[in-house]
A protein has these predicted regions:
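OB-fold ssDNA-binding interfaces and closely related basic DNA-contact patches used
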Residues: 31, 54, 79-83
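Charged, amphipathic alpha-helical segments
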Residues: 72-93
Length: 195
């Protein structure tokens, strides 16, 4: 039996968002990300007939991301349904869609390290909840948690609705991969850079 090379993925860094879907808007860097937790939920339903299971139906996958931050930028406040008024924020209830990406580190059993990019398309954000830490005995930072719902985007390339794109940095795609520091990347960006 031959196993694949053993790897471990860890850390979350360089979390960034666009102001609109498709990676065409300005790249917004998120500061103070303490947790970035994608989760997929897919329910099934057994349909009974003739005293047995006739069929099992699968509901569509629901992709959400729970993010903990120690602070939010003005752009992130707008994503959560706030509008800036006179230097402060009011809850407008308008949730603009955006794309979000992050970098993780992949350690291999042979000692090599590389980066992995995860991009999520057409996300919307609910408002944040705030931790109730108090400074009784020691200083505890407030943690702000919000949940994103990822709806996906059709890029017109025959792949249908794309909710998530994941790629590991290689020597062949490094030039394109490294542009993640200046823009939100799409699968089509890697056509010329290779896999």
């Amino acid at each position: 039996m031959v196993y694949a090379t053993r790897t471990i993925t860890h850390g979350t860094e360089n979390v960034a968002m666009s102001g609109g879907t498709g990676g065409t808007a300005t790249r917004i860097q998120s500061t103070g990300v303490a947790k970035f937790n994608p989760s997929i939920d897919q329910d099934s339903k057994d349909v009974k007939a003739d005293a047995r299971t006739h069929m099992t139906l699968q509901n569509p996958k629901k992709l959400t991301i729970e993010i903990d931050n120690y602070q939010y930028s003005d752009d992130e406040m707008l994503q959560m349904g706030f509008t800036k008024v006179n230097g402060g924020f009011v809850d407008s209830g308008s949730y603009a869609p955006f794309d979000i990406q992050r970098i993780t580190t992949v350690d291999s059993e042979d000692g090599t390290k590389t980066k992995k990019l995860d991009v999520y398309f057409n996300a919307t954000s609910g408002s944040y909840t705030e931790s109730d830490d108090e400074d009784d005995d020691e200083i505890n930072p407030k943690t702000y948690t919000r949940t994103l719902t990822v709806k996906g985007k059709d890029f017109g390339d025959g792949n249908g609705l794309v909710k998530q794109f994941t790629i590991v940095r290689t020597a062949k795609n490094a030039t394109v991969f490294d542009t993640n520091e200046s823009k939100i990347l799409k699968p089509s960006d890697f056509k010329t850079g290779g896999a």
